[in-house]
Amino acid sequence: MSKEIKFSSDARTAMMRGIDILADTVKTTLGPKGRNVVLEKSYGSPLITNDGVTIAKEIELEDHFENMGAKLVSEVASKTNDIAGDGTTTATVLTQAIVREGLKNVTAGANPVGIRRGIELAAETAVASIKEMAIPVHDKSAIAQVATVSSRSEKVGEYISDAMERVGSDGVITIEESKGMQTELDVVEGMQFDRGYLSQYMVSNTEKMVAELDNPYILITDKKISNIQEILPLLEQILKTNRPLLIVADDVDGEALPTLVLNKIKGVFNVVAVKAPGFGDRRKAQLEDLAILTGGTVITEELGLDLKDATLEALGQAAKATVDKDHTTIVEGAGSVGAISDRVAIIKAQIEKITSDFDREKLQERLAKLAGGVAVVKVGAATETELKAMKLLIEDALNATRAAVEEGIVSGGGTALVNAIAALDKLSEEGDIQTGINIVRRALEEPVRQIAANAGYEGSVIIDKLRSEKVGTGFNAATGQWVNMIEEGIVDPAKVTRSALQNAASVAGLILTTEAVVANKPEPAAPAMPPMDPSMGMGGMM
């Protein structure tokens, strides 16, 4: 395929057009009075959203050079979303502002490499200032404030803060679609995995169709149990204690399953069997987690252990186990706090090293089950379109809240970025490097300008007044009042704010130092079939 090449200002100008198209679309959503954008979907109803990264990913431009500019900004939004989970619109606004001012200077004859150095230096300094401003987040009300600002909904803020209070900052909070119109929070305490009883005859509560075991022993093995003789010595020991038994094994089949069921029905002893969760190496890891949580040992040939030789000391224990047809939940395992803490530390270390998003998600689920539990926010709405929009809002709020717990909070509404400008006054460089610093200085004001504009105010007037206010005071675009942003609960996670600036500065610097752009040349359209002459008859037809 032949290529089309543009150089110097032609290349940068074409990319800037694409950047402007994408950024102008996304930035209308910024702030408490930001608007929505409607996205056409290839199937189903259109998506109405104000989520910056979702909008950016949908934009494809016909002109290849413009599209490359748009895709570079989309990459900024995606990267910010990956790191902090929110702040994608802010990152887009910052990128546009830095590139636009930078191009003016490059076109006027400035050295783009020097400007890039100045941009990077200013960004590093501003990020350090933002980190210094950060206030740690611990209490429930602060968490609710972060979620409320991100989602623009106090109700969502309550759901997120309740969920984090129940399962902890390491706990897993998942978002699912509700079957009804109401949004609700469901918290599963203890360890739960998606395996149910192997026979419905093991049910103890026929009304709810669940098996409930109080103070059970838990046999954990990666082996298949087909012969009852393999576990008979162990069953005899358990029978003497008059306590129930939960068997977690690779499988229970052959004569073993009907024998266990028969003894359950006759009331000889209370036993429930379930398959082990997961597959392959992930199954081994989950069984080890379960053993540590309950204070037991995995009966496996890898450790030289045999079911015939198992004793009560090898079994796990818990305050309660509940098993339905799809799930097993174990509450208050008897494992030692030290062993569980060590296991949690190992999993956290694995999460930091892992590169696969899927593997990271699975590790986080394991971590949550050990650390506290799983909370499920079930999103309800009147229509499918509203449901999709609500899910995106809650996902952003959840990500922002986690970022706030991790690195603290700063004044919201773009105020922290403007406050960080003071740190740039300490930088004293020359020539193009100083020009780059000044470009970032101007760009840091842009989010406040845009938030004000979206709320119907003049951005320049707001910025002029904000410069004269003391640090922490900002403009509440929702009410039109000047307030202490932290006290008013208008806050942003420090991680979100600094990630937006870091990613915007990085990509903007690369765009400004671009001297040539290579794109695929559009293929000429195939000639259309000539129209049929109506005077020509259809042969063979009357």
Curated annotation (Swiss-Prot):
CDD domains in the record: GroEL (cd03344)
GO biological process: positive regulation of interleukin-8 production; protein refolding
Swiss-Prot/TrEMBL catalytic activity: ATP + H2O + a folded polypeptide = ADP + phosphate + an unfolded polypeptide
GO CC, any one term: cytoplasm
GO molecular function terms listed in the Swiss-Prot or TrEMBL record: ATP binding; ATP-dependent protein folding chaperone; isomerase activity; unfolded protein binding
Key words of the record: ATP-binding, Chaperone, Cytoplasm, Isomerase, Nucleotide-binding
Primary residence: cytoplasm
SUPFAM superfamilies xrefs: GroEL apical domain-like (SSF52029), GroEL equatorial domain-like (SSF48592), GroEL-intermediate domain like (SSF54849)
TM ranges: none
Protein's cellular compartments: Cytoplasm
Record-linked PANTHER family: 60 KDA HEAT SHOCK PROTEIN, MITOCHONDRIAL (PTHR45633)
Family: Belongs to the chaperonin (HSP60) family.
Protein name: Chaperonin GroEL
